[in-house]
Amino acid sequence: MKFVDSAKISVKAGDGGRGCVSFRREKFVPKGGPDGGDGGRGGHVYLRANRQLSTLLDFKYRKSYIAGRGEHGMGARKSGKNGNDVVIGVPCGTVVRNAETGEVLCDMVEDGQEIMIAKGGRGGQGNQHFATATRQAPRFAQPGEKGDEIELEMELKLMADVGLVGFPNAGKSTLISVFSAARPKIADYPFTTLVPNLGIVRYDDYKSFVMADIPGIIEGAAEGRGLGIQFLRHIQRTKTLLVMVPSDSADIAAEYATLLRELEKFDASLLSKPRLAVITKMDIAPEDFAIPELEPGIKVIAISSVAGQGLKALKDELWRQISTSTQITVDDAGN
């Protein structure tokens, strides 16, 4: 399935039905009073988060959602039926904005979370409501109100516990394939990963966490270079970051510093998240390879996904950070 993480749609709630102008006409009651019924309410439009969905692909093919119109009122005080509501399913992690103003309308985080995004118009009142002592036969009724109409911009930010960050060919996809059942494309050339991948990592029989692999970022990513910049938002919700540098890097410390700098340029709050430094591809490292200290207070773990070296220690440390994290994954600005 193609991965799509942004979309723009229009939604229109149903208009209310108009009230009825009618008068009671029965045998022996040739001049009965007004009995026009009310119009039905227009259908509402709702958004509902669904954990079974993982992409905004559907919105690339369907751009407009319109709820049902309320039925018009009828005689004999009969009200029209309400219009049919429309419920739009979105993946968990979808941020919804008003396309015109940029205002964040909702952040769909929890499975089953539902919000009314466009309210249906009220039905108009029938002429039965307008009879008075001096106006006993009103020949008018209310029209129905218009339903809300709005353009929406939707942006998906994946819900994961751990975000993998590294240059192309840092070994991110290999790690997630070893840790989980995810099967990303793996090859020995840059930008093998073209879309984010999610993997569920089993820690023991009853514990697990979600890991997100995004396309590799390069120096200048925050200014739009490479592929990773368009997917960096998918690590904004993570509880911890795994900053990965391969053992065969020409300058491990410089590469690590560049990665942190690109993260800070994109969103400075990313550096406030707990993180681990990981030296990958230890199976090809020379025997005298010395594990560097990359940053004060940040633990460095050396691994080989191919040989299985250091993976248990890495998994243990990730679980420790995740289980003790107080990271708030949804911010007020929807960033």
Curated annotation (Swiss-Prot):
Transmembrane segments: none annotated. It is found in: Cytoplasm. GO terms for molecular function: GTP binding; GTPase activity; magnesium ion binding. The keyword Repeat does not apply. Keywords: Cytoplasm, GTP-binding, Hydrolase, Magnesium, Metal-binding, Nucleotide-binding. Pfam families: GTP1_OBG, MMR_HSR1. Mg(2+) binds at S173, T193. Its cofactor is Mg(2+). GTP binds at residues 166-173, 191-195, 213-216, 280-283, 304-306. Residues 1-159 form the Obg domain. It is an enzyme of class 3 (hydrolase). Monomer. This is GTPase Obg. It comes from Chlorobaculum parvum (strain DSM 263 / NCIMB 8327) (Chlorobium vibrioforme subsp. thiosulfatophilum).
